[in-house]
Amino acid sequence: MRSRARTAVSVVAAAGATLLVALAAFFGLQRQGPAEHASTGAGAQELGAPDYGVCRGVSARCYHDWGNFSPATDGYRVLLYTRTAGPRHAHLGPALGAGLNPALADTNVVQNAVVRMGAEHGFTVDWTEDVTQLSTPARLFRYNAVIFHSTSRDALDDAAQTSLRQYIRGGGGFAGIHNAFGTEYNWPWYEGLLGGANFYDHGPEQRGEVVVRSRHDASTSGLPARWAFTDEWYNLVPAPSKVRVLATVDESTLAEGVTGGQGHPGHGRNHPVAWCQYYDGGRAWLTTLGHDAGAFTTDGSFPGAEQFQDMVLGGIESAMGRSPFCRAD
């Protein structure tokens, strides 16, 4: 009888202890939350690195060099994709016609800028907003890199999703610029291609300072240590993980603050704006910058435009394997 009583008391005591631990953890977390963001610039608490079920990171062991590209024979060629299935940035200009390389207006600022880059630096640029141009892996394997620049929402159909995945797995290159982060929200594999990152919100468009964090990629190797630029400064959830951060924004230089329209407090001292990674067999170079059409001007009227364009050019060239990509520090 006494044995059963002692057992019952032990069970009650253990249950009570478990409850106390749980309550302590709960209230501890409740107290920790505000403290995490109490000081300006603390940044959002990161919630871990998502798992996309692929080889990803900064090691070239995640790259598939399967001989799908012959630049010595075929030269270098990229495909610029700017389809929008939602909000359209002004720098894209009017929607393009069907097919490959449709007519461009002067107000198709991004498309004209990338075509000019190619012409000046020895690689061919095709452009399209026609999803059927991405309908098979064979179409994409003509290109050393595919560029998504300010695409939006569900810009790919099922066939194009499959083709892009097979292209990357076969050693293809990808460059995602600005609202590439506002694209294919419901496709986890694509989020991984972006570095395990996605657009959440942004604060006011304003001037800030970009800080180069690594020169081990062609995109940042020749840039000044700091340079002024005006942008929206995307806040990200999730934030990039298992990537090499190439550049950040110094949040202390943002006079109007970094808090976004949905309350994101920013990323503190490590607010990434450009990074690179190997992903599922391919190369991916990413930047959240490039909102303002002025960033693509060449007349010196937009501070930081020259540095931004140099970074994008280097990112494209590294993604397509022409220049050093995402090397170890």
State what each model feature region is:
Residues R77-T82, V125-T128, N144-S150, I168, ...:
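Structural recognition of the beta-strand scaffold that forms the well-ordered cores
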Residues F148, S152-A225:
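A glycine-rich, often tryptophan-bearing local segment used as a flexible ligand/cofactor-contacting loop or short
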Residues A22-Q45:
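C-terminal region of N-terminal signal peptides and the immediate post-cleavage residues
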Residues R2-Q30:
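Secretory targeting and sorting signals
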Residues R88-H91, S135-R139, D154-Q161, G176-I177, ...:
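Extracytoplasmic/secreted cell-surface and envelope-processing proteins
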Residues H91-A95, P102, D106-V110, P224, ...:
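A conserved amphipathic helix/loop scaffold
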Residues S39-R142, I316, P324:
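Aromatic-Pro/Gly-enriched surface loop or interdomain linker
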Residues Y52-H64, G196-L286:
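Catalytic beta-strand/loop cores that center a nucleophilic Ser/Cys/Thr
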